[in-house]
Structure formats: C-alpha cells, structure tokens
C-alpha cells in the first residue's frame, strides 16, 4: 500500500513506537489520527506536524470514545486505510512478591488495555474499513497492525500480565485476519 494520501490511526501515538510511526507516516504523505491519553505530548506532536495530523484523547478500552474518535477521523480525513495498535502498558510484578500476591486489579488492567483495548479499536476500525470502497483492483480496503512482543513467547520474571496480554494479541491476530480477509482487510502483528 502506498502511504501518500492514505489515513492512519495510531493508538499510543504520542510517544515511543507510536510517535515514530506517526512521524514516518507524515513524512510519506499520509494523514494521521493520534489516539492517546497524553494530551500534552499528543497535542504538541499534532501541532508540530501540522494539518496532516489530529490528536484525540482516547481510552482504547472505552467503546464510545473509540467510536467517536473514528468518526472524527473520518470527518477530518475521509476513509481510514491503516490502524497501528501501539497503546499499552506494563506492570512489573511477581505472582507472589515479598510474601504478597500480585494484585488482581493490576493484572486485569494490563489485559484490559493491551489485549481488550487492541481488540476494541481493531473491531471498530475494521467496521469502518468494511464500509469503504476498495482502494485497488484486488479489493483491498485497509491494514490493521497489532503490536505484540517477544514477551508473548519468552516472558520474564514479573511479566505475567504483560506476557499474557501480548500472547493474547498474537493468538487473536490470525483468526481475525481470517475473519476480515474476505472484506479486503489485512491484519498482522
């Protein structure tokens, strides 16, 4: 897919890999919607990169917030062609550390953001992509890229929640790719 003139959504786009991707997309002529919760960094990045970028404060686990941000992206830029799911957190805690069990709420929060948040965004973006006309003669409508980690396969001490979340991302990507292939939407990690 040529990036020039395409629109990308980048979750976690205000820093790290997400920010690097935002910059690369803009350098190659794409328009970008940053979905993040860091208003300061996201807003400054959008301002720095100009009219080709918008920032939306989005909690990826919030269905209504994601849907509203997708609508705003379509209103600003038209069809959505790319979605990079970078939003995520880590929680370094042993299953039992210093005689106490890891708080279940910490485990759930990592799963909620890294796994369920990724699924929430990709399913709503896929719905939007499926409603769009194909961009080429092969029927391609878009691509969704999920961010996993070697921790999905080789987690270390204190990475149970993070490893489980990234293992879930790896595990769901292939069946989702098969689900969406007939709609012209590619899904990769």
Where are these regions (language model features)?
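The beta1-alpha1 cofactor-binding region of Rossmann-like NAD(H)/NADP(H)-dependent oxidoreductases
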Residues: 39-40, 57-69, 104
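Catalytic Tyr-X3-Lys loop
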Residues: 81, 89, 100-120, 145, ...
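Active-site helix of classical SDR
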Residues: 122, 165, 173
């Amino acid at each position: 897919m040529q990036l020039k003139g395409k629109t990308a959504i980048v979750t976690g786009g205000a820093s790290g890999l997400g920010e690097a991707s935002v910059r690369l997309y803009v350098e190659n002529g794409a328009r970008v919607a940053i979905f993040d919760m860091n208003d300061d960094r996201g807003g400054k990045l959008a301002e720095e990169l100009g009219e080709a970028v918008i920032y939306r404060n989005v909690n990826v686990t919030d269905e209504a917030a994601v849907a509203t941000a997708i609508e705003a992206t379509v209103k600003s830029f038209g069809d959505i062609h790319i979605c990079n799911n970078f939003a995520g957190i880590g929680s370094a805690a042993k299953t039992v550390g210093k005689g106490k069990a890891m708080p279940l709420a910490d485990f759930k929060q990592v799963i909620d953001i890294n796994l369920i948040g990724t699924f929430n965004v990709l399913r709503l973006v896929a719905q939007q992509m499926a409603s769009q006309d194909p961009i080429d003669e092969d029927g391609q409508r878009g691509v969704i890229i999920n961010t996993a980690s070697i921790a999905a396969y080789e987690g270390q001490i204190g990475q149970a929640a993070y490893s489980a979340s990234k293992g879930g991302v790896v595990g769901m990507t292939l069946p989702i790719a098969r689900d969406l292939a007939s709609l012209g939407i590619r899904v990769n990690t």
